[in-house]
Amino acid sequence: MEGSRWRFRSFLDYGSLDILQPNVCYNGGYTETLKIASLAQSHNIPIANGGGWPLHNLHTMAGLMNGWRVEFHLGMQATGELLFKDPPKPDGNIVRVSKKPGLGLEPNVDALKDTLMLPRNA
């Protein structure tokens, strides 16, 4: 999996890929992923997120002219279902984007308490 916009650009320049698979968690966030998507669109190449974390990539894919598929890994989906209240879930091959504000993800504060890390000298 690639994370650098410049590597994706090289792939596009050489016509090496038919589909790009950026991921907001590995590409430097939403803005960087949008830049990669724009590069891909200029070459008429679709985007299908790769590497999982569907809950973080769903809105990006839905909002892109060349956005295509969202990759769902069962383990990462289970993590999202633990950390967020009522996250979007696939229904067959369809996932509906939440109409809630932002990413549509409400943190499960009770579950997050179990992940809290305190400084050693606290």
Protein language model regions, located:
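Shared catalytic-loop signature of beta/alpha-barrel
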Residues: 1-94
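C-terminal extensions of enzymes
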Residues: 83-122
